[in-house]
Amino acid sequence: MTPSAGLGLKSQHYGDAIACDAEGLWFEVHPENYMSAGGPRLAALEAVRARRPVSLHGVGLSLAADTDPDPEHLQALKRLVDRFDPFVVSEHLAWSTHRGAHHPDLLPFPRTRAALDRICGNVARMQDALQRRVLIENPSLYLPLKGHALDEVDFLEALATRTGCGLLVDVNNVFVSAQNLGYAPETYLDALPAHAIGEIHLAGHAPDPGGSNLLIDTHGAPVAEVVWTLYARLIARIGPRPTLIERDDDIPDFAALMAERNRAVAVLASGQTAREPAHV
């Protein structure tokens, strides 16, 4: 597939998604929302997939947990992969399960050598179960953790090298983390291994409603201008990559999302001459 820009598929936009004839448009879904045996949601995704490529962006495998991924979850994900043939499957660099309990968030962890070994094992298990390469997304961070042995870019690069996985770069996450933890987002993005980047996410953020100086990765606002600037800088270095406009809260009409998507298409077109191709 020629890299272009897509949208997160929302139930209120099923009809628009099926009817839209925009060139190169694709849609991303959270597979956890489609793991039922049937029903109207799966039927709608079938109708969209008949016209458009789709990607599956998981939120529930808890790859940074201290246990193996849940085998039943992996089996359900494999059934969706077989059914919809997504052009990308991705997951988060985070944990959300511990001692049998599930936490409804994507939580951080100390980037130790032991954590790298454990997560490499879990990513390998995911790829083996799905029989395909997956992409792993960088997290959004809010407070410093003690115990880091590796910086985040080095951790991600080692993960990609050891497992053969690719990277999903969420530019908004990079900006939010950089603002909250006090580093330059440009330095982070410039250090990422271009060959490993298989997809990019763009989303909105907001100030902490509690009044702190933190930024929160809300997915509830348009992509900020500073994130667009960082995105253009990244594309100028690495060349075009499939790019998603993420919106999970305060969702506007389809036309407003398409306007953001079309802006991403223009940035991708400007990066066609970059020299570092993706290995997706």
Curated annotation (Swiss-Prot):
InterPro entries: MbnB/TglH/ChrH (IPR007801), Xyl_isomerase-like_sf (IPR036237). Induction: Strongly induced by potassium chromate (K(2)Cr(2)O(7)) and cadmium chloride (CdCl(2)), but not by inducers of oxidative stress or thiol such as H(2)O(2), paraquat or diamide. Induction by Cr and Cd requires sigF. Probably part of the CCNA_03363 to CCNA_03366 operon. Transmembrane segments: none annotated. Gene3D superfamilies: Divalent-metal-dependent TIM barrel enzymes. Disruption phenotype: Not essential even when cells grown in the presence of its inducers dichromate or cadmium. Keywords: Stress response. SUPFAM superfamilies: Xylose isomerase-like (SSF51658). PANTHER family: UPF0276 PROTEIN HI_1600. Belongs to the UPF0276 family. NCBIfam families: PRK05409.1. This is UPF0276 protein CCNA_03364.
